[in-house]
Amino acid sequence: MNVLMVEPGKVPYETEIGSDLASLQAAVGGDIQAVYPYEEPVALICNEEGKLTGLPLNRALRDEDGEIYDIVAGNFFLVGLGADSFTDLAPEHAAKFAEQFKHPEEFARLAGKIIAIKQPLPEEKAPQKSHGGPEL
C-alpha cells in the first residue's frame, strides 16, 4: 500500500509497503502504535516504544493552535483508513502531510517548554568552505 514515510532528519517520501503486520513493524523498527490525530481518514503509524528505546526524535505533533503536544520518535508513516483496515494514502493527503512534515526538526527546552526548530532541507544547506589553506 502507498504510504508517506517520515524519517528523522529527512524529507518525507511516498513509498510502498505491505499491509501485513510484519511489514508495518519493519517500517518502524518494532511494535506499531496507530494514532489518529487528524480529521482526515489518516492514521499515523509509529514505533510503540520509540521514546523508551531511545530512537531519535523525529517530528512534533501540534494541536489546532500550533502548540506541541507530542513528539514522535523514530520512523513513522501516514496511511489511509479503510472501512476496517489500513489502505493507500490518498494523493491529496500525501501532498498535505508531505508539506506539513517537510522540514526535519530538532528539539530544545527553552524556559521550561519544549520547542521544535525546523532544519534546512538537504538541498538548502550552504556549501562548506575548506579552511585548510589559501584558495587558489
Ranges and model annotations:
Residues 1-11, 15-121, 127:
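N-terminal nucleophile
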Residues 123-136:
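Non-Sec secretion/translocation targeting segments of pathogen effectors
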